[in-house]
Amino acid sequence: MKSSLCLAACVTLLAGCASFEPAAPADYQGPTVNVADQVLPVSDQLVHVFEIRRVDGRRLLSSSIATLNANQGRGFSVTPVALSNELPLQPARLQLLATTQWAMPTLALTHPTCQTEGEVSFTPLDGRHYRVAGRIAPDECAVWVEEIESGQPVTSKVTGKGTGR
């Protein structure tokens, strides 16, 4: 009986695991454009993360996960890890995330936090450079994609509640 319960628990846990995929479909052979996530240090214990989570439904390895993995066991200190993705030169649906990420989860219980996530349309242009940008403040948590050279947004903004309590 115990082994059956253990097996059922393991199967349930593993079923929830999802693999990560590249931003471009496996069969895509055309040109791509780079879109960089941003992980901005606010203090030794806090970073603000602006990232792409999914492209056309494909789950990406994200900067928040990379930062979490790189900082496991470091206690009250966090070092940012920002990733970038090569997207095909074609219209896409991006799932964007803006979040506060503390060095330890317990810090989030007693400090201001925010997380907002949503989907936007994005049509990259050849020869341009892009980054995921955003704003985390007491009044608003927002994320969008912008062209690096001009600093101009190229997608709509996803907005949510800020860090104010």
Provide a role label for each language-model segment.
Residues 1-19:
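Sec-dependent bacterial lipoprotein signal peptides
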Residues 17-122, 129-165:
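Short loop/turn and low-complexity linker motifs enriched in small/turn-promoting residues
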